[in-house]
Curated annotation (Swiss-Prot):
The active site is at C78, H163, E165. The keyword rRNA-binding does not apply. Pfam families: GATase (PF00117), GMP_synt_C (PF00958), NAD_synthase (PF02540). Its EC number is 6.3.5.2. One of its GO terms (biological process) is GMP biosynthetic process. The lineage of its organism: Bacteria, Pseudomonadati, Campylobacterota, Epsilonproteobacteria, Campylobacterales. Residues 1-189 form the Glutamine amidotransferase type-1 domain. CDD domains: GATase1_GMP_Synthase, GMP_synthase_C. The gene is guaA. This is GMP synthase [glutamine-hydrolyzing]. PANTHER family: GMP SYNTHASE [GLUTAMINE-HYDROLYZING], GMP SYNTHASE-RELATED. It is an enzyme of class 6 (ligase). GO terms for molecular function: ATP binding; GMP synthase activity.
Amino acid sequence: MILVLDFGSQYTQLIARRLRERGIYTEIVPFFESIENIQKKAPKGLILSGGPASVYAKDAYKPSGKIFDLNVPILGICYGMQYLVDFFGGVVVGANEQEFGKAVLEITQNSVIFEGVKIKSLVWMSHMDKVIELPKGFTTLAKSPNSPHCAIENGKIFGLQFHPEVVQSEEGGKILENFALLVCGCEKTWGMQHFAQREIARLKEKIANAKVLCAVSGGVDSTVVATLLHRAIKDNLIAVFVDHGLLRKNEKERVQAMFKDLKIPLNTIDAKEVFLSKLKGVSEPELKRKIIGETFIEVFEKEAKKHHLKGKIEFLAQGTLYPDVIESVSVKGPSKVIKTHHNVGGLPEWMDFKLIEPLRELFKDEVRLLGKELGVSQDFLMRHPFPGPGLAVRILGEISESKIKRLQEADFIFIEELKKANLYDKVWQAFCVLLNVNSVGVMGDNRTYENAICLRAVNASDGMTASFSFLEHSFLEKVSNRITNEVSGINRVVYDITSKPPGTIEWE
């Protein structure tokens, strides 16, 4: 295993993802993790991530110096390299010419870490400081136009001023793999087939004959959780799907068909009337979310109680992912937690269930691979993200059944046309937003005053940042024509060309 010490870089999770893609199990912990906990994990190597601080600042992030007593190879990336230089007596200063974006890396000396790597390649830079003097015993391995010491080495300690984990670094994945395999002696043992076998065995042992309650949303995470649990405990899984009336067109039927194919019993609750009555007259986005969250818990509790009376439920399953676990601990210290993640928060006290989180070691892309391994259809696994509150946050203003129907039909047309044009898998997320704006139009000889709808399509890797998708005008024209002709109550279609930032992907 490789252990990454996180110093607050926006790219830290990418380090683990790049190594895992290559079959090398990798975990992330905050830089202040105790040496005792690090020793317990028994890593074969450490990677020190980048970060926003400067090593010469008073409040610079610094791990325990005892990491150097572990006698394992260490790789410092960006800030991590600067920390190594500073710790061993070199000099780091603010750079006159800061480096952000692509740069050409030129290898000047052979090293095991550059085995099979091109002499010159593009790398991704993101730093305001630079090393001007190496510590005693260190050697320069590579340079860039503005960084004379772009890669350094001293025995089994390495430093890279660039970010090998970012896709723009052409040879970055190979460099990380060389460190893990050739320097640390790791083996390629990580993969979803191995994970599935191990996790099913673990779940069987932990749950035994107890019952597990699992809320199914129709999304990828909850579907994969339910599938994995069913493989382990069969009919002791109680899967509950709440239809709140704010789903995409034909969503309920699609989820039911999927679970039927997977041979997993599904308890479907039709709660449309309950949700819509509570949302009546509400237009404020956060209040919508709050009402939907609270109502979901009420409906879920009622259903859980029915099953609880039939036979005691001992566990509650959640689709917590590894990024949720990482983000629950801030690099600023235990007292400054970024956020605590609960997929189903605010459950009543009588639901004193033990929590079970089968996916807590996995990234989103790994969840999809696991789903494929478990037999979930590829078409289902590659669906675009869908918000928990559903179409409620895609209808601006007050919600009504007629507005839901209007949005469902328009959204269905947009997605259908994306698939026909082989564009669906090329955009990260696409959907329609029903605006609380009416506009004047003309249909035949008649004046209309109807809803406007907005098409939204973005490209992203993880949703943290996103750029709007460049869709051909002819494609947009086709979608617009279909919506205005086929969906009653819509006479205008617009396309959102806002990126994130400054906008968010969803409108509410």
